[in-house]
């Protein structure tokens, strides 16, 4: 066996990005369980959701930054930070899987958050700047920064947009995904209201 054929040592610095990417790769095979319980035969994966949600977040952020004072902000959003928060927000599911709402309701928010935090520590230990990415994830969970709140809006908007797409393809009984939505930014509400209008226009 040549030196290039040797497997990477678990102590090799070059192995760490691959260990991290194994978690990212796992999200491509992990279905979003909410759609499964709703009867969607071939639902999107967590990776599908994260990719589109990242774009929703970026589009919202860039639009908000054109007139950020009108959205209740004192300064423009950090678009690079938003992209990082969006990309890490569901990484814990590579270990915990996409827990259905009925499970998280029984476990409680505190238990779920503790498990997610442990999973994120395990995943991000392979990154050179692991503390930064853990902080990005915490910003999403807490929603205590303008960027974290924007990504939380984008997460819900992507779900609702996906529900809209499934309904346009003939799926029924997805009304629960449209209910009781609260928004941090007026632009997010506008996005939702436009989807709502289109939904009823096509019904």
Where are the language model's segments positioned?
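Alpha-helical, largely C-terminal catalytic domains
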Residues: 1-203
């Amino acid at each position: 066996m040549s030196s290039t054929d040797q497997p990477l040592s678990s102590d090799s610095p070059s192995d760490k990005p691959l260990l991290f990417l194994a978690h990212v790769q796992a999200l491509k095979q992990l279905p979003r369980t909410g759609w499964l319980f709703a009867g969607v035969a071939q639902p999107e994966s967590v990776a599908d959701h994260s990719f589109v949600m990242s774009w929703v977040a970026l589009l919202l952020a860039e639009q908000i930054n054109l007139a950020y004072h009108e959205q209740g902000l004192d300064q423009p959003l950090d678009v690079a930070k938003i992209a990082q928060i969006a990309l890490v927000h569901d990484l814990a599911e590579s270990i915990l899987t996409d827990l259905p709402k009925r499970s998280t309701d029984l476990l409680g928010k505190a238990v779920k958050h503790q498990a997610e935090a442990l999973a994120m520590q395990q995943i991000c230990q392979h990154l050179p700047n692991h503390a930064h990415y853990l902080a990005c994830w915490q910003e999403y969970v807490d929603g205590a920064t303008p960027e974290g709140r924007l990504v939380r809006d984008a997460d819900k908007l992507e779900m609702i947009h996906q529900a809209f797409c499934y309904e346009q393809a003939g799926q029924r009984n997805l009304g629960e995904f449209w209910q009781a939505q609260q928004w941090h930014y007026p632009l997010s509400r506008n996005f939702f209201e436009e989807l709502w209008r289109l939904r009823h226009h096509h019904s």
